[in-house]
């Protein structure tokens, strides 16, 4: 019997929840689009999850500890965005949040369609994200509109005002530019107002409004949506004999491989090198291949168990158990070999992340292996919680900081005879404090010099405002030279014998010409012989004595634009920071 509701009833509680969703949607959109995945994003995600969970918890249902734990770990992961500056890890964590938050909310509301103990339960996240958030948008909007009409005079007037504000935005966007072009006095009045970013306003309103309705629809649908009962489907799959044939062939190959490589495996555990191999060759070879093998083995186990036509017989389970034990053994062996390599050559991002993945695969393999003979084990719940917990740890630790700290301490303590400064330089802001430590404490003068150069020429990015702030980046700023010029030209105004004059300081290699245009004049700076301008070279320009309305373009010898900047007509601040350029007025 179809029990699907054509609309979701809404009362005062839904109206309050909708207003909270509007705030969260606009806030999260603004801080993400114009601040990145940093402090603002962390606050926005935490607020949206807390609002949704609070709305769904007051429904008289027994609270699921599993769902609450998922959401709590999501909050911990979201908080890490205010600490870490690792773009790759943040991307992975965003993917985690996109799956875990809908899954946790669905289980909390009791609207999960699949058993949380099964691997298929992850599909509920997709159902909530697409099926409810988008599919139930008309129903939730209809219920919300009806609630506004029935909420009394204040509710009707409030809805009318919101609708009027929505219509006024595009109208004003047309009127204001036309009035500015028609009247100089009106344009001058607006120029004196605080800076207003039209693109930011439009982006926030348009995308924030869309996100607000999606957040509300997700919450309302999780509370009111009733899924039509589905008839149980006959289990289809492959005969056990077919799967056992596949598993036996895999087991046979592993048996032969283990026998042929036994000396190498035991050597890895004992710390003894096979003859004719150096430490680097022995420890490095095969580590990443073993990581891939672990993933393939786990896939074979899940494939065989999920495609078995009937309940997997003991023969299939024992074959899967053998593959699981081999997987754990491969993880232990690869880890032992990698520890040998790390002891002499230190850590890298790739080694750390690969090791984390292998440990996770080993944990999943153990859980699946136990589940083979203990079917009531909620292995999928454990897998989800372990994945989120490991993700939270990796995010908060910050891989660049962890790698740099280990390598620096191991090198300075004598545990490592050499340190890869090229890799240290490739790390992010988290490595700067430890590179600075090398510059001060390393005995090798070459290492000290390389460390000093890395600290001096590191690509420092100062947060434009609180939205783009994160702890690792903030900490690295303390080690930046007082006057750091990166990838461009610093613009300064200093008094001299002729009064205030504008001069440029070339801050990058390859600049051949710098064009400067003011509201009244234009000119350029080039060498007579066409040779590139030297980094640090000062070029005096007498046609400007302020930044107001100044346009600067730096070109290479081919005429390609390396950097350009147009300063506002009312720019008179004493410290102007834009992207990678630092502009100072003295």
List the model feature ranges, each with a label.
Residues 30-34, 43-184, 208, 212-224:
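Transmembrane-helix bundle segments that line or gate the permeation/cavity pathway
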Residues 1-54:
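N-terminal signal-anchor module of multipass membrane proteins
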Residues 251, 377-400:
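Internal/C-terminal transmembrane anchor helices
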Residues 392-417:
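Hydrophobic alpha-helical transmembrane segments in integral membrane proteins
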Residues 27-42, 59-63, 82-94, 188-198, ...:
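Membrane-helix interface and helix-disruption motif detector
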Residues 425-586:
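Extracytosolic and intramembrane catalytic regions of membrane-associated proteins
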Residues 2-16, 57-66, 112-117, 139-159, ...:
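Juxtamembrane membrane-water interface segments of multi-pass membrane proteins
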Residues 192-207, 275-295, 347-358:
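Short aromatic-rich membrane-water interface segments that cap or initiate transmembrane helices
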């Amino acid at each position: 019997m179809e029990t699907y509701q054509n609309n979701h009833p809404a009362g005062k509680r839904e109206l309050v929840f909708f207003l909270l969703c509007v705030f969260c949607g606009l806030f999260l959109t603004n801080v993400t689009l114009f601040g990145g995945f940093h402090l603002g994003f962390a606050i926005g995600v935490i607020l949206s999850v807390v609002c949704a969970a609070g709305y769904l918890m007051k429904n008289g249902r027994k609270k699921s500890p599993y769902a609450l734990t998922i959401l709590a770990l999501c909050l911990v992961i979201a908080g890490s965005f205010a600490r870490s500056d690792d773009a790759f890890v943040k991307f992975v964590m965003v993917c985690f949040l996109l799956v875990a938050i809908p899954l946790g909310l669905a289980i909390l509301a009791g609207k999960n369609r699949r058993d949380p103990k099964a691997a298929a339960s992850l599909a509920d996240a997709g159902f909530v994200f697409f099926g409810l958030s988008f599919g139930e948008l008309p129903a939730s909007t209809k219920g919300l509109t009806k609630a506004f009409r029935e909420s009394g005079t204040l509710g009707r007037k409030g809805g009318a005002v919101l609708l009027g504000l929505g219509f006024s935005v595009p109208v004003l966007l047309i009127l204001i530019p036309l009035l500015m072009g028609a009247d100089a006095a009106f344009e001058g009045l607006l120029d004196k107002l605080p800076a207003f970013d039209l693109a930011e306003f439009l982006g926030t309103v348009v995308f924030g409004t869309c996100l607000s309705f999606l957040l509300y629809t997700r919450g309302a649908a999780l509370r009111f949506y009733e899924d039509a009962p589905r008839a149980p489907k006959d289990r289809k799959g492959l005969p056990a004999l077919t799967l056992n044939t596949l598993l036996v062939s895999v087991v046979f190959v592993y048996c032969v491989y283990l026998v042929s490589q036994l000396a190498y495996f035991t050597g890895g555990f004992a710390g003894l090198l096979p003859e004719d191999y150096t430490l680097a060759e022995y420890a490095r070879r095969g580590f990443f291949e073993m990581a891939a093998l672990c993933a393939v083995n786990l896939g074979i186990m899940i494939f065989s168990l999920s495609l078995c036509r009937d309940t997997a017989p003991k023969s299939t389970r024992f074959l899967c158990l053998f593959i699981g034990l081999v997987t754990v053994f491969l993880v232990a062996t690869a880890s032992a070999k990698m520890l040998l390599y790390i002891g002499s050559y230190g850590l890298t991002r790739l080694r750390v992340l690969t090791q984390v993945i292998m440990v996770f695969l080993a944990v999943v393999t153990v859980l699946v292996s136990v589940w083979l003979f203990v079917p009531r084990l909620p292995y999928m719940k454990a897998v989800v919680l372990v994945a989120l917990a490991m993700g939270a740890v990796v995010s908060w630790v910050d891989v660049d900081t962890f790698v740099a700290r280990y390598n620096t301490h191991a090198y300075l303590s004598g545990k490592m005879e050499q340190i890869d400064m090229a890799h240290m330089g490739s790390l992010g802001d988290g490595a700067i404090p430890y590179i600075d430590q090398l510059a001060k404490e390393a005995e090798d003068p070459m290492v000290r010099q390389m460390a000093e150069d890395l600290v001096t020429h590191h690509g420092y990015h100062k947060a434009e405002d609180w939205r783009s702030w994160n702890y690792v980046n903030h900490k690295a700023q303390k080690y930046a030279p007082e006057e750091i010029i990166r990838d461009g030209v610093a613009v300064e105004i200093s008094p001299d014998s002729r009064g205030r004059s504008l001069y440029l300081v070339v801050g990058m290699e390859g600049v051949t010409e710098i064009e400067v245009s003011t509201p009244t004049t234009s000119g350029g700076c080039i060498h007579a012989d066409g040779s590139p301008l030297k980094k640090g070279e000062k070029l005096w320009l007498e046609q400007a004595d302020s930044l107001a309305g100044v346009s600067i373009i730096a070109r290479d010898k081919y005429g390609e634009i390396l950097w350009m900047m147009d300063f506002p007509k009312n720019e008179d601040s004493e410290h102007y920071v834009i992207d990678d350029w630092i502009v100072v007025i003295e």
